């Protein structure tokens, strides 16, 4: 494929991610667009298909193919600058072995469109989770709620308000969180 291996990422051609409050992202690590707002699937005028075919997604795809580094992908660029294997690098190797993204990219290069057949999708429908991973936080894991009051000063005011909304909206301060999964095989990488 005629793409720059230094910047190319297969995720915008093969993946989409949502947040518990309905926000749609090009991947779980992506920063918001330049206007600071990701579309929300809970908005009746917008859906995953619209996002997948949006000019925003096509601009990101173009940048990655042409060797540019979109700011939305800065988390991966920062990791790579520090000699850490990023999600982009992992998925490039992983998906290359499975040939998951070759056809969508070839189709895109000809038509500037990726078919709405998303092979990898991450749907976060709520923040209820029975794990407390170190890289996570209350937006994505209810197990972090008990620690939130101790660490919230390290987050921005907007994040604090949003997390407080989740905590209070789900009555998580008073309710014990149920474990949803009892075995590891419920989780798919």
Model features per residue range: what roles?
Residues 104, 111-112, 171-180:
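Short glycine/proline-rich turn/loop motifs
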Residues 1-95, 120:
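Accessory C-terminal segments flanking Radical SAM cores
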Residues 26-34, 123-176:
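Canonical Radical SAM [4Fe-4S] cluster-binding loop centered on the CxxxCxxC motif
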Residues 13-22, 111-139:
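N-terminal pre-triad scaffold of radical SAM enzymes
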Residues 168, 182-183:
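Glycine- and small hydrophobic-enriched segments that form the cores of compact globular domains
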Residues 82-119, 131:
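Recognition helices and adjacent regulatory flanks at domain boundaries
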Residues 184-189:
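Radical SAM/AdoMet-radical enzyme domain recognition
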